[in-house]
Regions:
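Exported/periplasmic ABC-transporter solute-binding proteins
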Residues: 20-45, 51-53, 58, 62-68, ...
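Active-site phosphate-binding/coordination module
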Residues: 93
Length: 249
């Protein structure tokens, strides 16, 4: 009897393995919340599990160069996926836009942020969280915005700099800075701020934050990887979910 139960258990394990597959995905920090929901939707629909790691695109690039077994990268920019393909680390022709990010000046304090370009220079704002523009596209967009406003030089002494947009958001969230230039997706859902107060920066003040996905060499020819990317790109519910976090498509 015990032998039969063991055989049934082993059969069940192999059956599950045959019907489901794990997909290793590296995801830019700004896309954390949407990816968690997309993963849950996809797993429910297919049984395939998304094993997502979240962090800085630059850090993922370094890991990928060192042989990390990620199959897909959802980057915070378009430059990194293009570089990955050029260097032979990714599959040619698979890098494409999955979302366009938006910048917001945000504070954890309700009714604090004013829609005024000189607000960041006011005495109310002691520290401003900004991502490193050399490492993070949202940091680059913040610098472009303040350059357009003409107040970058005066604002710089107030900067608290994060290596990526995740750390930058934490600075603003924990009041290490009164305000921060962060990704709209970190503080926005279904048409409104989820907490605090913010000013969605007009998109004509900075270059479009195009975010590309790319299939990495470990994911080449993998049917489950291709199916997941098709789901993200074409499924109406998936597209609606991404837009609900303030992204453009």
């Amino acid at each position: 009897m015990k032998h039969n139960l063991l055989l049934l258990a082993v059969a069940a394990i192999f059956s599950t393995s045959a019907n489901a597959a794990d997909i290793n995905v590296a995801v830019a920090a700004n896309f954390t919340a949407p990816m968690k929901e997309l993963s849950a939707m996809y797993e429910k629909e297919t049984g395939n599990k998304i094993l997502a790691s979240y962090g800085a695109t630059g850090a993922f690039y370094a890991q990928i160069k060192n042989g990390a077994p990620y199959q897909v990268l959802f980057a915070a920019d378009a430059k990194t996926p293009a570089k990955i393909v050029k260097e032979g680390l990714g599959v040619e022709g698979t890098n494409k836009a999955y979302a366009f990010g938006k910048l917001v000046l945000w504070s954890a304090a309700p009714d604090f942020v004013k829609e005024d370009k000189n607000f960041i220079l006011s005495d109310k704002v002691k520290k401003i969280a900004v991502a490193n523009p050399k490492l993070a596209p949202y940091g680059e967009a913040a610098y472009q915005t303040m350059t357009a406003w003409g107040n970058l030089k005066n604002a710089e002494p107030k900067f608290v700099t994060g290596d990526n947009i995740g750390k930058t958001f934490q600075y603003a969230k924990t009041a290490n800075a009164q305000v921060g230039f962060v990704a709209l997706s970190q503080v926005f859902k279904d048409g409104k701020m989820t907490s605090g107060s913010g000013w969605i920066i007009p998109t004509d003040l900075y270059q479009p934050i195009r975010q590309d996905v790319v299939v990495l060499n470990p994911g080449k020819g993998n049917k489950e990887v291709a199916d997941f990317l098709k789901f993200v790109e074409t499924n109406p519910q998936a597209k609606k979910l991404i837009e609900s976090y303030g992204y453009g498509l």
